[in-house]
Amino acid sequence: MTISLRDVTEENFEALMDMELPEHQRDLLHTNAYSIAQARFYDVFVPRAIYQDERPVGFALYNREDDGRPGCYGIYRFMVDYPLQSQGIGRRAMELLIAEIKAQPDVRLINICYHPRNERAGAFYKSFGFVEIGIDCNHEMVAEIRLR
């Protein structure tokens, strides 16, 4: 099984928009359709399709200037299609996403936010080196990786 990150294109965007989360996760994340629209209208967003071999299986969205701060990248969305969760796809995709962001010449910080009661997400992000720094104004947990 080969996991890769690819551009969102005319050929894959419908498959990405059709992906679903289980009922208990739906209130924790915007839809892929919403995220793809955001990326279309705001050029700081970078949408990425997660592929398993030649099949789209998930979606990620990050920005290049979190809250207007150059060098601060924020991972805004990260999801694997519900039937394919818990198979290692998300772990490999997150490794690739973090590596892609770290390869940017100006990066000094990567952050991610999640619902504080989503303990599974918290443990997942901590396993990549994210450190929780507190609750933001939207009542979400903020975690970050400082690089410089």
Tell where the protein language model's regions lie, with residue ranges.
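Conserved active-site alpha-helix within GNAT-family acetyltransferase domains
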Residues: 91, 116-134
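Short glycine-rich hinge loops at helix-strand junctions in the catalytic core
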Residues: 88, 105-106, 129
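Acetyl-CoA-dependent GNAT
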Residues: 3, 7-83, 100, 134-137
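Active-site acidic-Proline motif in GNAT/NAT acetyltransferases
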Residues: 81-83, 87, 116-117
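Terminal substrate-recognition subdomain of acyl/acetyltransferases
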Residues: 141-148
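Conserved GNAT acetyl-CoA-binding A-motif
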Residues: 101-113
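Conserved acetyl-CoA pyrophosphate-binding loop and the N-cap/start of the following alpha-helix
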Residues: 84, 88-96
